[in-house]
Amino acid sequence: MNHDPLNDVINTIKNASRIGKSEVIIGPASVMIGRILKVMQDYNYIKSFEVIEEERGGKFRVELSDTINNCGVIKPRLSVKNSNIERYESRYLPAQDFGIIILTTTKGIMSHIEARKLGIGGKLLAYVY
């Protein structure tokens, strides 16, 4: 069985949010996870995050907001064209214009809303609403 750090991060955030914690420590830190947290911060799903430097890898301290109802990792990491994003939006999000799908594109990690504006597709990573 392979280890999935992104799944660990998303589940840690979801569980901490459900029990009402205001802050959570996530490790190990990586560039990809930092960019995903930045997208979540841009859409106000988390208040802030910072890197805690340690000897091996470091960790993130994430300050949670009360706006997360559910979040999860999309597996397998499906490749989607810009024209097909709407299909996955209806599959993973409860309503149109409610929540975001995070995907990785040739322009970096972004939400499905930004990818649609740029007219590009990518690989689905996670959803948050």
UniProtKB/Swiss-Prot annotation:
PROSITE patterns the record matches: RIBOSOMAL_S8 (PS00053)
Top-level taxon in the UniProt lineage: Archaea
InterPro entries cross-referenced by the UniProt entry: Ribosomal_uS8, Ribosomal_uS8_CS, Ribosomal_uS8_sf
Transmembrane segments: none
Amino-acid biosynthesis among keywords: no
Gene Ontology MF terms: rRNA binding; structural constituent of ribosome
Keyword set, alphabetical order: Ribonucleoprotein, Ribosomal protein, RNA-binding, rRNA-binding
Matching Pfam families: Ribosomal_S8
Any one annotated GO CC term: ribonucleoprotein complex
This protein's record includes keyword Ribonucleoprotein: yes
One Gene Ontology biological process: translation
Coiled coil: none
Entries under HAMAP family matching the protein: Ribosomal_uS8_A (MF_01302_A)
Function: One of the primary rRNA binding proteins, it binds directly to 16S rRNA central domain where it helps coordinate assembly of the platform of the 30S subunit.
Family: Belongs to the universal ribosomal protein uS8 family.
Subunit structure comment from the entry: Part of the 30S ribosomal subunit.
Name of the protein in its database record: Small ribosomal subunit protein uS8
